Amino acid sequence: MYGCSLIYGFTGSTNFNVIANQLGSSEYAITFGIVFILVGLAFKISAVPFHMWAPDVYEGSPTSVTLFFTMVPKVAALTVFIRFLYVPFLNLIDQWQMILIFLSIASMLFGAIAAIGQTNLKRLVAYSSIGHVGYALAGVATGTNEGMQSSVIYIICLLYTSDAADDWS
């Protein structure tokens, strides 16, 4: 919310087109707003280093809720990531690209390594989900239409596999 407040405060609008047109006048201030919004979205999708809540929540939830948590909030937040970064802030790719590359690589590595030692299936699903977020963010981090499309296709494939896992359980 603070990031949205900063962007609105410096641009005077919530319209993405108006924000994109006003980037030159207060670019550094808007960058702070972007960083705060990215942190909030990274927490929502449980990307490393904002992932600490996911394994405990997944473990303590019923199986159907766990499978819901693995996809629905992540699909929504990744869609917001794409819409938020590609429409008004594609010109500021130098500011947000390195953040997403770090989140992506850290999530892929940590998700895979942490999943190896798990004996609880739900915690394994949580760490696997963290790794999958890293793969989806890798496409977004490219800043290209092809990268965005690959992330969308990856998310769609995850939806189908998550649905299959739900049917299996």
Residue ranges of model-derived segments:
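Alpha-helical transmembrane segments of multi-pass membrane proteins predominantly involved
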Residues: M1-S162, S169
